[in-house]
Amino acid sequence: MVGDTLKLLSPLMTRYFFLLFYSTDSSDLNENQHPLDFDEMAFGKVKSGISFLIQTGVGILGNSFLLCFYNLILFTGHKLRPTDLILSQLALANSMVLFFKGIPQTMAAFGLKYLLNDTGCKFVFYYHRVGTRVSLSTICLLNGFQAIKLNPSICRWMEIKIRSPRFIDFCCLLCWAPHVLMNASVLLLVNGPLNSKNSSAKNNYGYCSYKASKRFSSLHAVLYFSPDFMSLGFMVWASGSMVFFLYRHKQQVQHNHSNRLSCRPSQEARATHTIMVLVSSFFVFYSVHSFLTIWTTVVANPGQWIVTNSVLVASCFPARSPFVLIMSDTHISQFCFACRTRKTLFPNLVVMP
């Protein structure tokens, strides 16, 4: 008797749970909408929320580990490699993307709407855009740095400059300055979450929305993505030059049969392989995200699934890149081994030139 009663009440309790968390406004459930359709829609939001939660949580943990690792190297007095500052900046930018986009989107997917007012939404979107663009610029800097280091004939005077810590600091500063200024237009576009007063807003992210005219949206899309496409073009050129140089050097080594010549390029080849994995994954994820973003900007009424997938794809690289670096960096493996065996921090650390 009790079991039959629970079977009858279970669908009602499930529907009540979804109504409790997802019916914060009248737009979630129309009068003519069937309750089963609403249950499917709410279940889809739960799946999106779980995806955002796992991706954001894992990504923040990975990037936080990298930031702590590079800060430990700095504070313990060990010499930093030229790429350590670039990689730490990449981890910081990725953390900004996940923190200012992944966390609010996760909470909105689970039904926690109206978390931010207009001012909060503006700054959340602003810092997310800055983090995304700094991540792009940092990948370009890392790619160009490795290309010049691998093949100094590309730019002789730059090969000397990249060994200077001050020059690396200056390049990292240049990754921030233009994007802090150029993304100020986001403060004019973003509003608070949709409600009965601003239901005409164009794109709804659950916790924030933005509204702009079609002419302004098209102009903003062109100005916004033009530097990005130029950066992607630079990535393709630098990556192509590295692949060509490694292929030519491999042919030379095979022709000379010299172990002496193959020693150093093997280390450079491993570093180049790691950077190529980062660049290729960034290129794929960012290209898909750019296409979806342009679609939501130009199209009059983009579907909510496009907006959701755009945010999910945008967080793929920041969540996955730290683990590529963790698995490929020998310093990190030495650090983990030292912690496991409870030895002194970095007892046998070999500093790369």
Swiss-Prot record:
Q: What name does the UniProt record give this protein?
A: Vomeronasal type-1 receptor 1
Q: Describe the effect of residue 241 to F.
A: In allele VN1R1*3
What tissue expression does the UniProt record report for this protein? Expressed in the olfactory mucosa, very low expression in brain, lung and kidney.
Alphabetized, the UniProt keywords read: Cell membrane, G-protein coupled receptor, Glycoprotein, Membrane, Pheromone response, Receptor, Transducer, Transmembrane, Transmembrane helix
What glycosylation sites does the entry record?
117, 198
Main role?
A: Putative pheromone receptor.
One of the entry's Gene Ontology molecular-function terms is: pheromone receptor activity
Gene source species: Homo sapiens (Human)
Q: What else is known?
A: The chimpanzee and orangutan orthologous proteins do not exist, their genes are pseudogenes.
* Chain ranges on the Cytoplasmic side, renumbered to this chain: 78-84, 154-169, 248-274, 325-353
Membrane-spanning regions, if any?
57-77, 85-105, 133-153, 170-190, 227-247, 275-295, 304-324
> Where found in the cell?
Cell membrane
Name where it mostly resides. Answer: membrane
Q: Which gene encodes it?
A: VN1R1
- Tell me its family: Belongs to the G-protein coupled receptor 1 family.
